[in-house]
Amino acid sequence: MAYPFQLGLQDATSPIMEELLHFHDHTLMIVFLISSLVLYIISLMLTTKLTHTSTMDAQEVETVWTILPAIILILIALPSLRILYMMDEINNPSLTVKTMGHQWYWSYEYTDYEDLNFDSYMIPTQELKLGELRLLEVDNRVVLPMEMTVRMLISSEDVLHSWAVPSLGLKTDAIPGRLNQTTLMAMRPGLYYGQCSEICGSNHSFMPIVLEMVPLSYFETWSAVMV
């Protein structure tokens, strides 16, 4: 999860987030090289009064600075399109969970079970226990099996919300009257925190999301108790 004064992205927990981290580094490297070149040229122009008259109207130079940016954009676009298609791909999910956004809490329904649903509210600051995180803890966590494909169906009952868990590379809008879907797969157990990422009213900041990724055997025990 995030920590104070963090500069980079959160550690990846899912294959999609790992791909996003690689794409981020790839794009940042290209941007850094371009910025360095531009700053170098500007510094040369500011520190010398010499002018190359042969480059004032050179077709070759114009050709280069037209083709080169096109190549750079292609190098950025191709990996981006690949990841976009990966994020939309859904192959035989092992479990489906429906989440509904409300002002200002989330409700969850495990559609593969007959009667397994609950609401998830933020725990107020004055009720937190030692070691719990302010504005991020909830009274009912979403327990999911790790190393399995889980499909999330996301919608809203009132206004626009957005269901986001950064360490899993997830951010899907919750739109009234529309059912969006995304998939997740965590590669290791743990607690993963997120928040509503769409301004939805006065208590927008108080809609945390907590996913508890556990081994399949523990999940089966938990679901049997909950049902």
From Swiss-Prot:
GO terms for cellular component: mitochondrial inner membrane; respiratory chain complex IV. It is a multi-pass membrane protein. GO terms for biological process: ATP synthesis coupled electron transport. Cu cation A1 binds at residues 161, 196, 200, 207. Mg(2+) binds at residue 198. CDD domains: CcO_II_C. Residues 1-14, 88-227 are mitochondrial intermembrane. Its EC number is 7.1.1.9. The chain crosses the membrane at residues 15-45, 60-87. Cu cation A2 binds at residues 196, 198, 200, 204. It is found in: Mitochondrion inner membrane. One of its GO terms (molecular function) is copper ion binding. Belongs to the cytochrome c oxidase subunit 2 family. This is Cytochrome c oxidase subunit 2. It comes from Lycalopex culpaeus. The lineage of its organism: Eukaryota, Metazoa, Chordata, Craniata, Vertebrata.
